[in-house]
Curated annotation (Swiss-Prot):
Alphabetic keyword roster: Transferase, tRNA processing
A Pfam family hit: Methyltransf_9
UniProt source species: Stutzerimonas stutzeri (strain A1501) (Pseudomonas stutzeri)
Recorded family membership: Belongs to the class I-like SAM-binding methyltransferase superfamily. CmoB family.
InterPro entries in the cross-refs: CmoB, Mo5U34_MeTrfas-like, SAM-dependent_MTases_sf
Assembly and binders: Homotetramer.
GO MF terms, alphabetically ordered: methyltransferase activity; transferase activity, transferring alkyl or aryl (other than methyl) groups
Name assigned to this protein: tRNA U34 carboxymethyltransferase
Recorded name of the encoding gene: cmoB
Enzyme class: transferase
Length: 320
C-alpha cells in the first residue's frame, strides 16, 4: 500500500486547502502508528493482489477494471479481495472478479448523479466508506476527491482499488470529519451520504459540512427520512432497523428547514426512494444480516421494531 500523500499536496497546491494538505501526511502517520488489530492482516490482503496494469478503466457507467489475465491470476485476485470482506458498498468488477457487495451503490449513484455537475470540482466525501462513490465522482469529471472515514477496513478496500489506479486523484483518509481543521472552506462540493442519522447533533453536522465548502459551494446530502411536515422528526426509542446509533430521521420539509437554519440557500430535494431488499441484501461478499432481516417479515413497510421502513432522500443546498 502506497500511503505517500505528496501527490495530494501537489494537487491542492494553490488552493485554499494547500496548508492543510501539506500537514496531512503527519496526521495520517500518527493514526497509522495507533492502527487497528486487524490492520496488518488487511494490508497483507491488499499486498497479495496480483500486479496487473488495467488496459480498460470504466468509472463513468460503473466501476470496472479489465486486463488480459489467466484463471490463476483471477483466482488470486478473488482470494485477496475476499480477505477484505465484508464488502458493503459497490459493486466492483476487477479483472473478471465481480465483487457483489451488500449495497447496490450504483443504484443510489444513478439517482444522485443526474442532478450534479462535478466537472473540474474539488470534492470532499464525508463518511466515504470504501470509496466506491469517490471513483464514480472521478468518472463524472471531478478534479480531485478526498474521502474521510475512520473505518480501517474501508481504508484498505479503497487501497485495493487504488493499487490499480495510482495516478488518479482520489485519496481516502482514515479520519472522522471532526479530525479535519475547522473552517477549511476549500471544497467546491461536499457529499454526506448515509451519515446524518448517525449524528446526535444533526444541525452541528450540517454546520461542519458548510465550513468545509467554499462560498458558493454545493452540499449533497443523502439521509434517512420519514413522512411528515416541517415539524416531523422520528427519534427511535432504541434501535432502528437493528441499528443502535440512529438518532434523528426528519421529514423532507423538516430537513429543508434544518438546512436553511444552518445557513444554506437554494435548498431542494431531488430524490426520495424507499430502500428495497434488492438494493441492500446479504451476498457471498457480505454474509452477515442485511435489510431483509431488519424488516417486519409480514410487512416490509415496517422495521422489526415497528417503525417506518428505510426511505432515503437526496437534498442539494448551496453555501452563500
Amino acid at each position: 500500500m502506497n500511503l505517500d500523500l505528496t501527490p495530494l499536496a501537489w494537487r491542492l497546491a494553490g488552493t485554499p486547502l494547500a496548508a492543510w494538505a501539506n500537514d496531512v501526511q503527519q496526521q495520517l502517520d500518527a493514526k497509522l502508528a495507533i492502527g487497528h488489530g486487524d490492520l496488518p492482516r488487511w494490508r497483507r490482503a491488499v499486498d497479495a493482489l496480483p500486479t496487473l496494469m488495467p488496459t480498460q478503466i470504466e468509472l463513468r457507467e460503473c466501476f470496472r477494471l479489465a486486463a488480459p489475465c489467466d484463471e490463476a491470476t483471477r483466482q488470486a485476485t478473488r482470494e485477496a479481495l475476499m480477505g477484505l470482506s465484508p464488502w458493503r458498498k459497490g459493486p466492483f468488477e476487477v479483472f473478471g472478479v465481480h465483487v457483489d457487495t451488500e449495497w447496490r451503490s450504483d443504484w443510489k449513484w444513478a439517482r444522485v448523479a443526474p442532478h450534479l455537475d462535478l466537472a473540474g470540482k474539488r470534492i470532499l466525501d464525508v463518511g466515504c466508506g470504501n470509496g466506491y462513490y469517490m471513483w464514480r465522482m472521478l468518472g463524472a469529471g471531478a478534479d480531485s476527491v478526498v474521502g474521510v472515514d475512520p473505518n480501517w477496513l474501508f481504508f484498505c478496500q479503497f487501497h485495493a482499488m487504488k493499487r490499480y489506479l495510482p495516478e488518479l486523484p482520489a485519496w481516502h483518509l482514515p479520519f472522522a470529519l471532526e479530525e479535519l481543521p475547522p473552517k477549511l472552506e476549500g471544497f467546491e462540493t461536499v457529499f454526506s451520504m448515509g451519515v446524518l442519522y448517525h449524528r446526535r447533533s444533526p444541525v452541528d453536522h450540517l454546520l461542519d459540512l458548510k465550513d468545509c465548502l467554499v462560498r458558493g459551494g454545493e452540499l449533497v446530502l443523502e439521509t434517512l427520512v420519514v413522512e411528515g411536515d416541517e415539524n416531523t422528526a422520528l427519534v427511535p426509542e432504541d434501535r432502528y432497523a437493528q441499528m443502535r446509533n440512529v438518532w434523528f430521521l426528519p421529514s423532507v420539509p423538516a430537513l429543508e428547514r434544518w438546512l436553511r437554519r444552518a445557513g444554506f440557500v437554494d435548498v431542494r430535494c431531488v430524490d426520495v426512494s424507499v430502500t428495497s431488499v434488492e438494493e441492500q441484501r446479504s451476498t457471498y461478499w457480505m454474509r452477515y444480516q442485511s435489510l431483509p432481516d431488519f424488516l417486519d417479515p409480514q410487512d416490509h413497510g415496517r422495521t422489526v421494531e415497528g417503525l417506518p421502513a428505510p426511505m432515503r432522500a437526496v437534498l442539494l443546498a448551496r453555501k452563500p
